[in-house]
Design a protein with these regions (language model features):
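A short acidic, amphipathic alpha-helical/loop segment
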Residues: 19-22, 81, 114
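C-terminal and late-domain segments of enzyme folds
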Residues: 1-30, 39-53, 58-60, 139-141, ...
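Class I SAM-dependent methyltransferase SAM-binding "motif I" and its flanking Rossmann-like core
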Residues: 95, 101-171
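Portal/gating segments that form or line small-molecule/metal binding sites
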Residues: 40-101
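Residues at the starts of beta-strands that form the adenosine-phosphate
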Residues: 31-32, 65
């Protein structure tokens, strides 16, 4: 089974060390983390490099080997040396930024194929903010605009993920708009800031400071750190 680690915000901060340690303990690979700040590339090289350095410092403090894989464009996602680095790692970590940018780089790329191969052999896909959102189900073919995330790549094919979910609650109508337009057979998981979920796509555990909101077929519930929930395939 694949392993996913999704964070609502707060990548490369001390609060996430515990759940990352749990995830890496069961991961298959060379023991390293491949850091991909791809979603921030549109904001300029200085932002991309800052996120990369934050990741390196975080894992250095935790005693975990890590390297930045500098994928910024669709062309980069076809480079053999970058694909090899992703395939070898125990954890492939996409930090935050613009989900549309990240999805555009990954969609139909050899890198995405490599990520699936890594998951199949036991690596962890970790994503914070945009990195979590692109794991959502693929938009239905021919569906009207807004019925599912346009940037979902289907890593978890029956779930859509929202991030910064507690912040979204402070924007009138934002949560309703995002959840009311999802297909009826889709689970929705809203992850608060500085909160994470770890699981295999069906069974999840909650970690961090906030809550996780689950909505789906016959379900409307919230969960906190130490609790578990499921998102079974329809």
């Amino acid at each position: 089974m694949p392993t996913f680690l999704f964070l609502g915000s707060g990548e490369f901060e001390p609060w996430s060390t515990e759940v990352e340690t749990i995830a890496l303990a069961g991961a298959v690979g060379d023991g390293s983390v491949a850091i991909l700040p791809t979603a921030s590339a549109a904001e300029g090289d200085h932002v991309f490099e800052r996120w990369g350095q934050m990741g390196l410092a975080h894992y250095r403090d935790d005693g975990v080997p890590a390297a930045v894989v500098p994928i910024k464009t669709p062309g980069d996602a076809r480079r053999d040396e970058f694909i090899a680095a992703v395939e070898a790692a125990s954890m492939v970590y996409f930090s935050g930024g613009k989900p549309s940018r990240l999805a555009g780089v990954l969609r139909d790329s050899p890198l995405l194929v490599a990520i699936h191969r890594a998951l199949d052999r036991g690596a962890v896909y970790a994503g914070c903010s945009a990195g979590a959102m692109v794991a959502s189900r693929v938009r239905d073919a021919g569906g009207r605009r807004g019925t599912s995330w346009l940037f979902g790549l289907g890593l978890v094919p029956h779930v859509s993920f929202g991030v910064h979910w507690d912040r979204a609650a402070r924007i009138p109508g934002a949560q309703w708009w995002m959840t009311s337009r999802l297909p009826d057979d889709t689970w929705f998981v809203g992850i608060d800031e500085k909160t994470a979920i770890l699981g295999d796509g069906v069974r999840w555990s909650v970690h961090g400071r906030g809550r996780v909101t689950l909505r789906g077929p016959g379900e409307d519930a919230t969960y906190r750190a130490g609790e578990r929930f499921e998102t079974p395939s329809p």
